Each structure stands twice: as C-alpha cells, then as structure tokens.
Amino acid sequence: MTVILGIDPGSRITGYGIVRQEGCKLTYLGSGCIRTKVDDLPARLKLIYAGVSEIITQFQPDCLAIEQVFMAKNADSALKLGQARGVAIVVAMNLDLPVFEYAARQVKQTVVGSGAAEKSQVQHMVRTLLKLPANPQADAADALAIAITHCHVSQNALRMGSGGLNLARGRLR
C-alpha cells in the first residue's frame, strides 16, 4: 500500500490530491486547493509551505508527485510557478519524502488518453477513475491526475522490473 500526494503548483491556487494505491486499486483519500489571497509573493509562498506541510502531516504520504514547469509565454508567471513548485518540493524533501515529476502532457496522456486533453476531460476521468460523486475542482483534479499518473508509472515500472526505468528520487529517469 502506497499513499501518493499529487501537487498541481500555482502561486495563487495550488491543487492537491491524495490517493492510496494497493496493487492496481486506487482509493481517493482527499483533495482540495491551497488558496493564497495575499498579493505579496513571499507571503503566498509561506502559505503554500504551511498548507503543504499540513497536508503531509494529516495524510502521511509515502511520496509526492508534482507537475513539471512548462514553458509559459509570460516569463513572470513561469518564475512564480517555479517558486511555488519549489516550495512544495522543499517541504517534501525536508520530510524525506521522495519527489517525482511529470510533464502535463504525460499526465493528460495517462489519465485521458490524449496529451492535448482539456481540463474538463481530466476532471471527468479523475471522477470516473476514483469513483467520485462529482467532478473535483479543476486544480484539485489536476493534482489527483498527477497522483494517478505516478501510480500508473510506478506500477508499470514494477511490472517491468529493472527494464530501463529508474524510479529514483527526483525525476523519472
């Protein structure tokens, strides 16, 4: 049994989702959003740090799966996203949790079957895969999709043995 915390980082809204994996079975444990309503970026990062710390304390995950930074058209937005992402990674690393990173296209491909899927499609598939009564909010759905992707990738790596996949701390290599 493994508990995975998925994080969809953002400087204003950071989504989180927690799933438990037992073999091929996934169980929804919780999800939500850390909302930072202050304008000051350092204060927002502090709120993200506190929020992720609280989630880890509450759910005791075995690892953290997080979305990789993508190339944004707005450099300022990309920098803020990277900082929010870095805060979540630091929290996990300070608590000795392994961190795994996944590209947004890989997450969409794994959960929906298309790397170009729309947010609504991700929400629908997360709802279906986890047997939820309603679609989760978009950022929480993305975080759950990241956790589901990690479950899928780690399960495939176990099936393949050491056949080229190395699930070490950090990126899937």
Curated annotation (Swiss-Prot):
Keyword Cell wall biogenesis/degradation recorded: no
Active-site residue numbers: 8, 67, 139
Subunit structure: Homodimer which binds Holliday junction (HJ) DNA. The HJ becomes 2-fold symmetrical on binding to RuvC with unstacked arms; it has a different conformation from HJ DNA in complex with RuvA. In the full resolvosome a probable DNA-RuvA(4)-RuvB(12)-RuvC(2) complex forms which resolves the HJ.
Gene3D superfamilies named in the record: Ribonuclease H-like superfamily/Ribonuclease H
Co-factor(s): Mg(2+)
Described purpose of this protein according to its UniProt entry: The RuvA-RuvB-RuvC complex processes Holliday junction (HJ) DNA during genetic recombination and DNA repair. Endonuclease that resolves HJ intermediates. Cleaves cruciform DNA by making single-stranded nicks across the HJ at symmetrical positions within the homologous arms, yielding a 5'-phosphate and a 3'-hydroxyl group; requires a central core of homology in the junction. The consensus cleavage sequence is 5'-(A/T)TT(C/G)-3'. Cleavage occurs on the 3'-side of the TT dinucleotide at the point of strand exchange.
GO biological process terms held by the UniProt record: DNA recombination; DNA repair
Lineage, uppermost ranks: Bacteria, Pseudomonadati, Pseudomonadota, Gammaproteobacteria, Enterobacterales
Record's catalysed reaction(s): Endonucleolytic cleavage at a junction such as a reciprocal single-stranded crossover between two homologous DNA duplexes (Holliday junction)
The protein, known as: Crossover junction endodeoxyribonuclease RuvC
